[in-house]
From Swiss-Prot:
GO terms for cellular component: plasma membrane. Belongs to the UPF0259 family. Signal peptide: none annotated. This is UPF0259 membrane protein KPK_3195. It is found in: Cell inner membrane.
Amino acid sequence: MSITAKSVYRDTGNFFRNQFITILLIALLCAFITVVLGHAFSPSDEQLSILSEGDNLAGSAGLFELVQNMTPEQQQVLLRASAASTFSGLVGNAILAGGVLLLIQLVSAGHRVSALRAIGASAPVLPKLLLLILFTTFLVQMGMMLVLVPGVLLAIVLAFAPIMLVQDKMGILSAMRSSMRLAWANLRLVAPAIIGWLVAKTLLLLFASSFAVLTPNVGAVVINTISNLISALLLIYLFRVYMLIRN
């Protein structure tokens, strides 16, 4: 049976609409966790103010030159802020992926599922998911930094890895290798969804300033929730594609 993107989009939309409240609560909870962790591990406002001190940063042409012109104390604060942002984002994304994928599994099995139950059921796979997302994020971002196309291509071919890890209980490297083969063989179904997801995430960043009317923490939760909903929609689509291909 031929799989058409249109039919998968329709199935994805139906599931997203029917489970919207649960998905929204998962997205909101993950956004809250991301913001709280980021706030807890980030430098204080007083420490962050060090980054704007001195004239040594004026005239820096790029990011690398900017970092080189910083004092050791400024570099330490920047490193801590970057690490806090990266860690909180990875934890939030791992919980989101686990929660959404377990929600799909449980609903497909005929169970009524709450957001907390879906996240709780994903607890056993969260450590592996966290490592998987760390590896894939690193590879994709390195590809984006070198040239845009390799980063996008890596995002496409690694798209099935979280699903294979959760659904088929694969190891991290096995899931990545299997995802590369399967996604490449079904590029016409995977590529448009991944590119659309990347564009949506980019547009959200561009419009982030629109949330400036809110307090910083509330604005961060709102932006992260919207971003999580976009990612949840992609996960539902990819899960549906994967199950159709496997069957």
